[in-house]
C-alpha cells in the first residue's frame, strides 16, 4: 500500500456497535468511511436478484466482479448504497441478506476479489474502516485499531429492539441463535477468521452508550497522534 493516509480500523462481531460508532467517528474526523460488510451484502443482493445458487462459488465470484457498488456517504445519519445503479440500502439491512453475506464471505475467492476494492477507500485525509478483518487482513499497517465486542445476549437485544422499532415482529431467541451461529461461522472460517488484531484496543460495549464508545475511540486517536 503506497497511500500513507491514516486508517482507523474498527472490527468486531455483528451487533457490537461498530457500524454506528464508525460512522459517527468518521463524520467527526472528516474522514472517509468504509462499511466492508455492505460490500458483501451488496454482492449478496446482486446474487439474490440474479437468483444464483449460494452453493456455486464460481457463479458468486463472477457476480462479485460484475457487481458495481457505490456508497453515498451521509455523515452520522448512515450510508446509502447503490447496487448496479439501484438503491438497495433497505434490502442490505434485511436479516436474510446478512445471512447470505456471511455465507458469501466464507468463500476465499470472493474475499480476494473484494480486497483491493476495499483498500481503494484509503484516501486523504483518512479512513475509518468498519468490518471483521480490517485490522488483520485489509489494513494490517493501520496506525489505529479497535475491536468492539459485546455478549451475544446484548447484541441480540439491540437487534431485537431495532427491528421492533421498525415494526418487524421477531422472536428474541431466534435472533440469539442466528447471532451465535454467525459468530461461529465468522470465527471458524479458514480465510480471515474473526479475531482481534494483536495490536488492537479491545472495547466491550455491553451496557455502554454509543457516545461513550465514540469518546473512547476518539480519545485513542488523540492520545496516539503527535
Curated annotation (Swiss-Prot):
EC number(s) recorded for this UniProt protein: 2.7.4.25
Catalyses which reaction(s): CMP + ATP = CDP + ADP; dCMP + ATP = dCDP + ADP
Cellular-component GO terms for this entry: cytoplasm
Primary subcellular site in the record, as a coarse category: cytoplasm
The keyword Secreted is assigned to this record: no
CDD domains: CMPK (cd02020)
Signal keyword on record: no
Record: residues binding ATP: 12-20
UniProt record, GO biological process: pyrimidine nucleotide metabolic process
Superkingdom of the organism of origin: Bacteria
Keywords of this entry: ATP-binding, Cytoplasm, Kinase, Nucleotide-binding, Transferase
Coiled coil: none
Pfam families: Cytidylate_kin
GO MF term set: ATP binding; CMP kinase activity; dCMP kinase activity
Localization per record: Cytoplasm
Family: Belongs to the cytidylate kinase family. Type 1 subfamily.
Protein name, per record: Cytidylate kinase
Annotated organism of origin: Xanthomonas campestris pv. campestris (strain B100)
Amino acid at each position: 500500500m503506497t497511500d500513507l493516509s491514516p486508517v482507523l480500523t474498527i472490527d468486531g462481531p455483528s451487533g457490537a456497535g461498530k457500524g454506528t460508532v464508525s460512522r459517527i467517528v468518521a463524520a467527526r474526523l472528516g474522514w472517509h468511511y468504509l462499511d466492508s460488510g455492505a460490500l458483501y451484502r451488496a454482492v449478496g443482493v446482486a446474487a439474490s436478484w440474479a437468483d444464483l445458487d449460494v452453493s456455486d462459488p464460481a457463479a458468486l465470484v463472477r457476480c462479485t466482479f460484475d457487481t458495481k457498488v457505490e456508497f453515498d456517504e451521509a455523515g452520522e445519519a448512515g450510508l446509502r448504497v447503490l447496487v448496479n445503479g439501484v438503491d438497495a440500502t433497505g434490502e442490505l439491512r434485511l436479516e436474510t441478506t446478512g445471512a447470505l453475506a456471511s455465507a458469501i464471505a466464507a468463500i476465499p475467492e470472493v474475499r480476494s476479489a473484494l480486497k483491493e476494492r476495499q483498500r481503494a477507500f484509503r484516501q486523504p485525509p483518512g479512513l475509518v474502516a468498519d468490518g471483521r478483518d480490517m485490522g488483520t487482513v485489509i489494513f494490517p499497517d493501520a496506525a489505529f485499531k479497535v475491536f468492539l465486542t459485546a455478549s451475544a445476549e446484548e447484541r441480540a437485544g439491540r437487534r431485537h429492539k431495532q427491528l421492533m422499532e421498525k415494526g418487524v415482529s421477531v422472536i428474541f431467541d431466534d435472533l440469539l441463535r442466528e447471532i451465535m451461529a454467525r459468530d461461529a461461522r465468522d470465527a471458524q472460517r479458514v480465510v480471515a477468521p474473526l479475531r482481534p488484531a494483536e495490536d488492537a484496543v479491545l472495547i466491550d460495549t455491553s451496557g455502554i452508550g454509543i457516545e461513550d464508545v465514540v469518546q473512547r475511540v476518539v480519545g485513542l486517536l488523540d492520545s496516539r497522534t503527535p
